[in-house]
């Protein structure tokens, strides 16, 4: 059994897999803070109860706030991989790369060649008038609901240095 204290989390997603065998019922993707993320990798784990984790796979390169979700319509595990230079640059700063696979642990092992550019913020995302910085896509998650995938875009409106100087969290907005 794995002790999760070995894996400090910057971002983490846990999904209950109703179609899996009992010993793989829960799936977790965890990305450590940048200072602790060896090779800019995350970890994927499985569990029978969501408390004790019995396996892990080191992922391919990914930025902090990378996550995963399950697409029940395609029966694929989707890795929403954040980049800020880890996989390549985007014209609008932080962006998302996409990786999908029918097997959770196998899909977690990727190279730059296995992922594709997915999306980023654009000129339709309005900047915060106080900072007037170009918005960036900080996170993107989704969930299957009835017959559609509902996505939630988290748009970053300022920068780390601004937030640190003001002694507050970064400003983000959630958009459907």
Residue positions per predicted region:
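Beta-rich carbohydrate-recognition and catalytic domains
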Residues: 1-138, 143-176
